[in-house]
């Protein structure tokens, strides 16, 4: 009876212990607790999830604004802002465009630049950018977080953090990167160091913050860093 009562108490206490795992590793049998990250939490770490059929652009933009500029915005906030100057009927059928994103960013005092770049210069992109890709026949906007020699890391508003082979990424990418520029950019933001895929043992390259000179080459100005 005593054991059954103890089990019942542990079950009732379960919700308050969610996300933690007890580890008996201390001398004398003391218990410590370690935060446990679910597969879903890891998949969408640092990303804004897409909630509607037409809002991948808004979710991708909100991800960059939250993580790289520490702005308190979510997908709904960005959608409302972009709809002010967008064709709402066109948005419902085709989604937002990069022009809609550009107008929204300018309305909040930021800048946007679109660059057409080739595969050979992909490694020169040192900031998180919005890109349009086709994955499994589905075209939508994602955040390109980081490019390496053989891999490209993306933050997909629907699928979460993904690592694509360079060839797979290039096959679905239209060659354009959309950069968000402005004051308060965090040069060590989390998007530049995406989660290691669950199937990978280690990363090939360690994260290194980008210097001012590299950022200015991409469109930032000196006052953005103060």
Swiss-Prot record:
N-terminal signal peptide: 1-18
GO cellular component annotations of the record: membrane; periplasmic space
Active-site residues, as the UniProt record annotates them: 56
UniProt-listed Enzyme Commission number(s): 3.4.22.-
Peptidase C39 domain location: 50-180
GO BP terms: proteolysis
Localization terms from the record: Periplasm
Disruption phenotype: Deletion of just fapD in an overexpressing strain yields cells without amyloid fibrils. Deletion of the entire fapA-fapF six-gene locus shows no visible growth phenotype.
Keywords from the UniProt entry: ATP-binding, Hydrolase, Nucleotide-binding, Periplasm, Protease, Signal, Thiol protease
Molecular function terms from GO: ATP binding; cysteine-type peptidase activity
One of the Pfam families matching this protein, by short name: Peptidase_C39
Family: Belongs to the FapD family.
Function noted in UniProt: Probable cysteine protease that is involved in processing fibril precursors. Upon overexpression of the endogenous six-gene locus (fapA-fapF) in situ, cells form large clumps during liquid growth, make large amounts of biofilm and produce amyloid fibrils. Expression of the 6 gene operon in E.coli strain BL21(DE3) induces flocculation and biofilm formation with copious extracellular fibrils.
Protein name: Probable functional amyloid protease FapD
Organism annotation: Pseudomonas fluorescens
Encoding gene (name): fapD
